[in-house]
Amino acid sequence: LPGVTGAGGLQALIKGGLPVAGERIVVAGSGPLLLASAATAQDNGAQVLNIAEQAHWSAVAGFAAQLPRWPGKLLQACTLFHPGYRANSHVVEALGDGRLQAVRLSIGGRIRKVACDRLACGFGLIANLQLGQALGCRIELNALAVDDWQATSLADHYAAGESTG
């Protein structure tokens, strides 16, 4: 259904010039990418109505409790807070005739219909660091540490993409 994208996809489209000013957006799924995608949309003039986090509050609290180990990420998380953030929530249905017009959200077990122009979904995007770790690359802030040229801590070993944060 046009108007429905991945959360990372919407973020990339916006950074590539997609105009979203004035659009009503719902972001749904799991993980910190939801907050980053919502912030990108909002910074570009979109009205982010809800961030529907699939994880329960206990899981979100467990994740948040780990953030003080990485002060930079803790500060970033604080700047990404959104009043429409709801844990224990998920999309039940995307509604529209030829284009997205609304979504049905389950928020804490209660169904709510939200009129919107875009839905961005992302579920459990976690960078895979296994190869870099196995090779002995230095890890910083849950990512492979790289310099400005994408070189890792190992000579002649480079990394790019999500694994580098």
What positions do the PLM features span?
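Short, ordered loop/turn segments at secondary-structure junctions
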Residues: L1, G9, E53-H56, H90, ...
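Rossmann-like NAD(P)H-binding beta-loop-alpha module
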Residues: P2, Q11-S58
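Catalytic cores of large soluble enzymes that bind and process phosphate-bearing ligands
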Residues: P2, V26-L33, P83, L95, ...
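FAD-site-proximal beta/loop scaffold in flavoenzymes
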Residues: T5-I14, R99, R118-G165
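A generic local secondary-structure boundary/capping motif
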Residues: K15-G17, S37-A41, V92, G109-R110, ...
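Phosphate-coordination loops involved in phosphoryl transfer and adenosine-cofactor binding
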Residues: A21-R24, N88, D97, L154
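Flexible, glycine/proline-enriched loop segments at strand-loop-helix junctions
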Residues: E23-A28, P32, A61-F63, C116-L119, ...
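A Rossmann-like FAD-binding core segment of flavoenzymes
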Residues: Q42-Q130, A134-E140
